[in-house]
C-alpha cells in the first residue's frame, strides 16, 4: 500500500517573525530582495527565527536507465549511465565539484541502471535493470512502482534520521528527460512539441525522434492520468518514482528540499499529487533550459533561485543555488537591527528617505 502521512504546513509564526526581523535589520525594507523571502521560508521550515545555518546539506542522485533510449532519443549511449554512477561515486562529476564548494555531501543510488550495481550500498534499493520502453510498454510493473516509491521514502527517512537539514534531489540517467517530458506534458495538458527540449545537446533529428516518443507515451498515459502511481508505472521509471517518493517524504519529515532540473521537477509534479501540500517544503533551485521545466515550475507555483542556462542534471543547478540560500540565512541571523547597531531608521514624514544603497 502506497501512502504518505498528511503534510503539515511550515511554521507561519516563524515566517512572520522572520519578515518582521528583516524589516528591523540595518537596511532599507526589502533591499535584499528574494533573499528576504528565502530566509523567511527557511525560518518557517525550521520553525524558528532567526534560522540556523545548514549543517548537513545532502545531495541524493537517483540513477536509472530507460528503454526509450533504444529509439535514439539521446546523444549519449545507455552505458554512460553506469559509467557516470561510478564517476559520481568516485568524486569526479560536476555534482561533486559543486557540492564541495556549496558545503554539501553527495550520495548516488542505483534504482534501475542497466548494469550490475556498483556496490551493495549503491544498489541497496535497486528495483530492476532499466525501465521499460514507455512508447510501447509500461516502464514498471505495479510491484516495481510501489518498491521504487517506497525506496524514495526510505532514502529520505534515512537521510533525515542521519541529520540532514536540507535535501537536494538529483538525477542521472541517459534518456531520462524523455519520460520526464511525458509526465510534465500529461500533468500540464501540454503538447509534446512544447515540452521537449534538446537535453544533453541532441541534434534536430534526435529531437524529432524524442518528440515522437513522447507523443506515443503520452497517448498511452491518457487512461491512467488521474492516478499518479499508475502514471509513474506507465510512463515514468524506477528513478523517477523514487524521486517522487523522496520529494514527498522530505515534506512529511518537515525537511526543506531544493529541486533541480527537468527530471527531478517532473517527479515533484507527481509527488505533489501523491502528497498534496508537499510543495510548501520545496524551492526550485534553478531554471533549466528545458522548456518543460518552466511548465513544471509554473504548475508547482515555484520560482527558481538562479537561472544560469544549465541543463546538466545530477542536482547541479540546485547545488549552485545552495550558497544563495546560505546567504539568505546568514543575513537574517547575523545582521544587526537598527536598535542593536545604533543606526537611525528612515524618518516617518512624507519627505523622508531610506538609507541609501551602499
Curated annotation (Swiss-Prot):
It catalyses: 5,6-dimethylbenzimidazole + nicotinate beta-D-ribonucleotide = alpha-ribazole 5'-phosphate + nicotinate + H(+). Transmembrane segments: none annotated. It comes from the Bacteria. The keyword Transmembrane helix does not apply. It is an enzyme of class 2 (transferase). Its EC number is 2.4.2.21. Keywords: Cobalamin biosynthesis, Glycosyltransferase, Transferase. One of its GO terms (molecular function) is nicotinate-nucleotide-dimethylbenzimidazole phosphoribosyltransferase activity. The active site is at residue 314. Pfam families: DBI_PRT. GO terms for biological process: cobalamin biosynthetic process. Pathway: Nucleoside biosynthesis; alpha-ribazole biosynthesis; alpha-ribazole from 5,6-dimethylbenzimidazole: step 1/2. PANTHER family: NICOTINATE-NUCLEOTIDE--DIMETHYLBENZIMIDAZOLE PHOSPHORIBOSYLTRANSFERASE (PTHR43463:SF1). HAMAP family: CobT. Catalyzes the synthesis of alpha-ribazole-5'-phosphate from nicotinate mononucleotide (NAMN) and 5,6-dimethylbenzimidazole (DMB). Belongs to the CobT family. This is Nicotinate-nucleotide--dimethylbenzimidazole phosphoribosyltransferase. It comes from Mycobacterium ulcerans (strain Agy99). The gene is cobT.
